[in-house]
Amino acid sequence: MNHYNTPFYKFIWHKDPDGSLLDKEVVAVEVLNLLRPIVANAVWIAFIALALHDSPPGSALTNEQLKSFCQETRRFYPFFPFTVAKVREDFTWQGYEFEKDTLTLLDLYGTNHHPEEWEDPDTFIGTRFVDSKQRPFSFIPQGGGDVDTGHRCAGEWMTLLILQETVDFLMNKISYQLPEQDLSYSLTEIPSLPKSRIRMRDVRFNTSDGLNPAT
């Protein structure tokens, strides 16, 4: 690979309009902005494969059912346990005092499993989101609120598209077997992943002529 075409190289040697190189802190942030979504989507893809194994759809999915299955995967499985924020100004909420500069945590996983918001929250229901109208702070696997005015992840829609393509690929484009492995996952690890990751065997592409071994 020509290292001149790598993102890291371009960030390091990028110059502002005045000809100055970026500060090293800015370069580090931009590199992390690339790495974070790559790692995040890899985690989601692993859990999509696990969801298809643990709760396989009974038949071909409509577009709405496909989206719902991906949303339920994001709700049900642990992605990132919390987000962090610092209080800007003193305020009181439901009897709790929040002082300025206090570091606070928002429980993402707990919110996505809250029994007052979700029926049977600890059960994976692939069709849960079909015709569902969720409030902006009840379904928050990647933050809550509005993308434009809050802290909801701006790349959430792209993540959903990637996961829908993944489900379609695993269900319709290939066939495979999962050998015996440890598919359990921890609620205390960051990020959480199936213990054995997802190991596949006998992977074959579906073609018009039948099944061909994957290369």
Residue ranges, per PLM feature:
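Conserved cytochrome P450 K-helix/beta-meander segment immediately N-terminal to the heme-binding cysteine loop
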Residues: 107-134
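Charge-rich, low-complexity terminal tails
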Residues: 186-215
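Conserved cytochrome P450 catalytic core segment spanning the I/J/K helices
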Residues: 1-42
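Cytochrome P450 heme-thiolate "Cys pocket" and heme-binding signature region
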Residues: 117, 130-195
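Cytochrome P450 catalytic-core helices
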Residues: 28-32, 39-63, 154-174
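Short, hydrophobic/aliphatic alpha-helical segments
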Residues: 17-33, 127-148
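Conserved cytochrome P450 K-helix E-x-x-R motif and the immediately C-terminal K′/meander segment
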Residues: 61-96, 105
